[in-house]
Amino acid sequence: MIPETYLNVYIGFLRYAAPVLVILLLLRCFKPLLTFRKEPEIWAWLMLQDGSKIPVTHWENTVGRHRKCDIRLDFPTVSRNHGVLTRYDDGSWTVSDTDSSGGVLVNGEKVNICALHPDDVIDIGGIEMMLVPISRHQEERLAELRSKGTGLGYNLANVFLLTVFQFLCAVGYLLSAGGEHVQSVMLGFGGIMVCQWLLLLFYVCIRRTSYEVETIAFFLCTMGMCAISAVVPSDSTKQLVAMVLGIILFLMLGWCLRDLERAKKVRYLAGIAGIGFLIITLLFGQEYYGAKNWLVIGPMSLQPSELSKVCFVFVGASAMDRLLRNRNLIVFIVYSVMICGCLALMNDFGTALIFFVAFLVIAYMRSGSVGTVGLAITALGFAGVVALKIAPHALQRFNSWRHIWEMPLDAGYQQTRSLMCMASGGLLGLGAGKGYMRSIFAADSDVVVATICEEWGLVIMVLMVLSVVALSFFAVRSAAVGRSSFYVIGACTAASVLLVQVILNALGTVDVVPLTGVTFPFVSNGGSSMIGAWGLLAFVKAADTRQNASFAVRILKKGRGQDA
């Protein structure tokens, strides 16, 4: 048994050491993600008949009269969005028509989509041109000039800092527990340490050395393990298994997204799986606290809607040649209505809101129309009024919103206690295992930010939120140089889903928005939530175009006609 004096000394040391370590770690992770250069890349030239040439700066390029087109042809015979010019991994090119009025011709023949060969003459709205791709040598030069990802040494230092922080956390909870739950705490924190080092080793083997995105995710997983160790230490093994499954899903999606054509094919399976998960839950799920969103299989219980988020992002992402066709947008709208309809029948309005935000992001990125988004928001307003009329569970949440101190022993019990515990934690927290949130319902999930804030302080809680904000900014910055709209839409939508979850969880805890029961990605206790968060992270990682950074960008082998 550790004397109380020694325990207090260690906890006091940890209260000051932890914020310093976390600030240093996250600054090192944030800097390369938010400051990398966005160099324009030229992959080919369009040679016009008058001798002028237009640079082709993306792998997918819209061609038309609209000012937002990548390749703008300001002629009255050219449609606003006339066609798409696409490059593939093997260096080949295609041109496709996007339901334009004049059509696209190649060597005088009208085409819907056509592979391009040297000396082919492309006719767009009567404007003839030839595509001249860059040479292999120029492509190698482009790869050399691309922003370099951080090196192995840099990321080794980051993971070492994180490991030190994890070790200090584990010791703090072991000492506070007084010999209880030793195995659970050691397995939980030790398992995260092993996983993060093994994943880094795997990256080294495949020559990918940038590891900031994953380091941020492992930091958030560590804070989640802290909350579990404080509230329900026996759940640490379950959460560790979920994290391992999430990492496997992350790598599987990475392999799938590495080949854009393969990703397009898997998208249809993802669509079937996404709606299938919800239908199965609707038929066989069990209702807890007003929402029928749990599927119980023997000793296991899961929320399939968390996995449906990943499928929804996969379905929403689309290549440019299909992006501009109204038929595809209509199909996606119908699919979205089916998803939200299932969630409404399940009374899972928090998750439905997240799906709707994802839909807004995808709809805007697909159409570029603010009017489309405005119409969708108006529809949400009407749907929300109807939902509050027919669902007493949702109405109760809104009745207590902004009135929790008027009913502190009833509907406001959870949030009022959370606010008091957060206030008692202050900037640096009470210390590992010294909080009182363990007696509050869902202290490790719905109101997990209060548990972290009480024991680790407001500083670390805010850094948790900023971690997800940084991932979102990184996704937006990567979009400017994205190789394909598939990656751009996927990354921005996934980052938006993660960010909205954080907003609903954190602000719901402090009664700024209604408490929806939405989880904090990577932090909240819940296997389905953990797996889904890692799945969404794969889309953010895939959008990274820095040199040797992402598993979605192949490494160019010099002097050879193929990529690694």
Over which residues does each language-model region extend?
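Hydrophobic alpha-helical transmembrane segments
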Residues: 19, 190-195, 244-246, 454-475
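Hydrophobic alpha-helical segments of polytopic membrane proteins
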Residues: 326-345, 349-389
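Hydrophobic transmembrane alpha-helices and their immediate junctions
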Residues: 459-502
